[in-house]
Amino acid sequence: MELKDIKTIAVIGGGTMGSQISELLSYVGGYNVTQWSRSDETVKRGIDAIADRLKKFYVEKGKMTQDEMNQIMGRIKGTTSIEEAVKNADLVMESALEKMDIKKDLFQKFDAAAPAHAILATNTSQMNITEIAAVTKRPQVVIGMHFFNPVSRMKMVEVVKGTLTSDAVVKMICDLAKKLDKEPVVCKDFSYGFIGNRVYRALRWEALDMVRERVASPQDIDKVLKIGFNWPMGPFELGDFSGAWGTYAISEADAIKEFGPEKGKLHPLIRTMVRAGYTGGRHGKGIYAFWDEVASKW
């Protein structure tokens, strides 16, 4: 199979990343997309989020007509059935919760229901591709395709090769990334966090230490990195936008398994925040609010 043979893509997960990936695939790639989520409510929320972004950032700014937006939205449909989502897919793109047992369960279902030629990809930012692939009968077509958040602005895509992933599939996913106007970098899967998040993990830990030590507020730390280092978003702004604080807490056991207890453990400030309900993302409150409402008063 070649890139030109990919016509229909299933996106599994309609949250912050899944809906952005669906938008990119339809808007930039021109693909037919079936977006799966667990309930009718979350399916609608994910598709509505795409429409809201297109309207706000393109139609209302004169960068896109309403007819063009309607065409993009017309290529995206939603479902609560995994079998329905993947049955005609040439590529399955998983963007669900960052827990290994959840991903293994999903990939077993993809393997059973997707066409024999379909490539099975995951948007994981850290999980081992070889371990995910081992639950399928087609490990040679299981691959990581990690988009960075926000998907529309960030050019980087990490293409993550499992031990048994074929070179042909790696090339095809790199070609797809380029078609979507992204810059692919190929890496091996035995680095937990791959390239970006392994480096970012160390930086984030230091930034969180500075907040805990009251060196500066999260807002000011972000300001230094955005203005001083020309980052589009600071680490705290990014965590609040994506809801990553909750994800880090959920995936702590996997991180410890890969990194060991010292490097893999959750930062205590994240643990305190998440326990108090400050997870960011669609839940609204993250570390900015936690600082303003709680930590700055300690």
Task: Give residue spans per PLM region.
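NAD(P)+-binding Rossmann beta1-loop-alpha1 motif at the extreme N-terminus of oxidoreductases
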Residues: 1-56
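Structural motif
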Residues: 12, 20, 79, 95, ...
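Structural/interface elements that position substrates and couple domains in central-metabolism enzymes
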Residues: 34, 183-184, 196-206
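NAD(P)-dependent Rossmann-like dehydrogenase/reductase catalytic/cofactor-binding core
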Residues: 1-8, 29-30, 168-171, 178-189, ...
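Rossmann-like NAD(P)-binding element
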Residues: 42, 56-59, 63-119, 127
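Acidic/polar active-site rim loop that often engages polyanionic ligands
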Residues: 30-31, 87, 150-160, 232, ...
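Amphipathic alpha-helical segments at domain termini/boundaries
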Residues: 9, 23-26, 35, 71-91, ...
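Rossmann-fold dinucleotide-binding core
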Residues: 119-189, 198
